[in-house]
């Protein structure tokens, strides 16, 4: 097992930033014992050596620049810092391009059609099949096999398998994992005289709290959830109550299951009672936006949202995190989890450089730094200790505790097709146009037809 660091790392990537810093510190330490003239000379020599090291790396990288596509602006600062380390070591420059989720896949599809995909980009379980079946992604299988730094067994197998097309071609390297937790407004709880959420909470406790936290004038609601928020929203309670979205063999829908109907009905009943904003409000405002504005007391949200929520002044002053409630009957407290992958265009003009970046981003060093900076929960095993400390004002441990009972985000070859259909049809349940049971029957029929055509 080859790990990052030591002589092996230096041979592959050149001097690390840490090594340069240590060398610089040593030079400064010696200089402090010299005369002013000698100190100046030592400083110039130090600068010269640093410049030569940087220049050597740039020459090794050929001055090339990789285009990197992501959709989350909150992760850009941390990823830039990590990629700067990569550039210092290899000379290969990177340019991150941020396209919001709503336009990201349209941008990629246009790039794939026009032959102008970014060199390296994020891949998702929703979309991997589309790009895999049309051979749009660089096959990393042999490169991973020959790598002396990547340790694929350190990543969750379910995440690795998402990006292993038909069980053979590895088309992406895991970037992260995510879990779901409960965010709550401590100030609102205090005003209502309600104890903060903890591991004893059931969904019934949650419902009772939502009722007490709702103000009759519409200025404050107990919670909020959108029909489009599947992984971080309604999916978790569906699985807690014994339901599911898609069967394990990915051949049939789970919307005819008693637990699925029960979980969704639980939520829509609370909406009908007025304990959550009506559909027309959540259609225009994301849950986190309402939470940050002090309009709702509770939301469920993914760990990927930490940079936004934890850096919001209102949230910092008033809110905290707890594990999700559990089902009173089954005792289940499930978190739907997922993980992004680093992929490259099959037609990139810089396949070796793209691979080097992906290899680096999947290394223990980069994965550790990603966690340390609080960007996300890294996928590499054993790198989460410092992630918990990245936002000390909040109970980040709740997200790690949710890893105890996790279910991979539902997906198949046509995920986006049936996911969009589900989102559209759930609107009728959210706004009360149809009963939740009737909507589930409609979804079941259409989803099974879609799965049969995969």
What spans do the regions from the language model cover?
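Long, aromatic- and glycine/proline-rich binding clefts that accommodate carbohydrate-like moieties
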Residues: 161, 322, 372-420, 424, ...
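A structural signal for short loop-to-beta-strand junctions that line the ligand-binding cleft
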Residues: 110-111, 116-119, 148-188, 221, ...
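Extracytoplasmic/periplasmic substrate-recognition and gating elements
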Residues: 64-67, 84-89, 93, 168, ...
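Hinge/lid segment of periplasmic solute-binding proteins
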Residues: 56-60, 126-181, 318-322, 388-392, ...
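Extracytoplasmic/periplasmic solute-binding protein
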Residues: 166-175, 180, 190, 204-253, ...
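Glycine-centered hinge/linker elements that transmit conformational signals in sensory
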Residues: 209-212, 250-280, 324
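Extracytoplasmic "Venus flytrap"/periplasmic binding protein-like
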Residues: 85-155, 191-193, 290, 294-298, ...
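Short, solvent-exposed loop/beta-turn-alpha elements that line the ligand-binding surface or hinge
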Residues: 59, 141-155, 199, 223, ...
């Amino acid at each position: 097992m080859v790990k990052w660091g030591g002589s092996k790392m230096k041979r592959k990537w050149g001097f690390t930033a840490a090594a340069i810093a240590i060398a610089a510190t040593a030079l400064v330490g010696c200089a402090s014992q010299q005369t002013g003239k000698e100190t100046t000379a030592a400083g110039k020599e130090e600068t010269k050596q640093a410049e030569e090291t940087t220049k050597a790396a740039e020459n090794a990288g050929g001055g090339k620049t990789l285009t990197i596509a992501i959709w989350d602006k909150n992760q850009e600062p941390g990823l830039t810092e990590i990629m700067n380390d990569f550039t210092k070591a290899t000379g290969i420059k990177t340019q991150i391009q941020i396209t919001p989720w709503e336009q990201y896949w349209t941008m990629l599809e246009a790039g794939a059609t026009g032959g102008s995909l970014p060199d390296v980009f994020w891949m998702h379980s929703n979309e991997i099949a589309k790009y895999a079946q049309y051979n749009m992604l660089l096959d990393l299988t042999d490169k991973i096999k020959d790598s002396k730094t990547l340790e694929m067994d350190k990543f969750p197998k379910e995440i690795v398998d998402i990006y292993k097309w038909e069980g053979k071609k590895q088309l992406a390297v895991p970037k992260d994992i995510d879990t779901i937790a409960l965010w709550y407004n401590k100030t609102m709880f205090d005003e209502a005289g309600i104890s903060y959420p903890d591991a004893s909470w059931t969904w019934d406790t949650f419902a009772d709290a939502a009722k007490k936290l709702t103000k009759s004038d519409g200025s404050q609601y107990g919670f909020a959830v959108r029909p489009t928020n599947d992984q971080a929203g309604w999916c978790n309670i569906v699985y807690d109550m014994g339901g599911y979205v898609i069967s394990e063999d990915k051949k049939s829908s789970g919307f005819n299951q008693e637990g699925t109907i029960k979980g969704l009905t639980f939520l829509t009943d609370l909406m009908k009672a007025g304990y959550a904003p009506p559909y027309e409000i959540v259609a225009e405002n994301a849950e986190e936006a309402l939470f940050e504005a002090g309009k709702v007391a509770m939301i469920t949200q993914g760990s990927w949202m930490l940079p936004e929520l934890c850096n919001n002044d209102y949230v910092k002053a008033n809110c905290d995190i707890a594990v999700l409630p559990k089902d009173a009957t089954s005792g289940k407290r499930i978190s739907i989890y997922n993980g992004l992958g680093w992929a490259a265009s099959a037609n990139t003009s810089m396949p070796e450089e793209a691979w080097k970046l992906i290899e680096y981003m999947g290394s223990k060093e980069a994965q550790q730094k990603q966690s340390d900076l609080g960007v996300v929960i890294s996928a590499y095993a054993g790198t989460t200790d410092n992630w918990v400390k990245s936002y000390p004002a909040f109970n980040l441990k709740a997200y790690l505790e949710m890893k105890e009972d996790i279910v991979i985000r539902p997906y198949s070859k046509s995920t986006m097709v049936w996911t969009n259909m589900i989102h559209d049809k759930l609107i009728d349940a959210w706004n009360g146009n149809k009963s939740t049971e009737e909507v589930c029957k409609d979804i079941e029929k259409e989803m099974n037809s879609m799965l049969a055509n995969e």
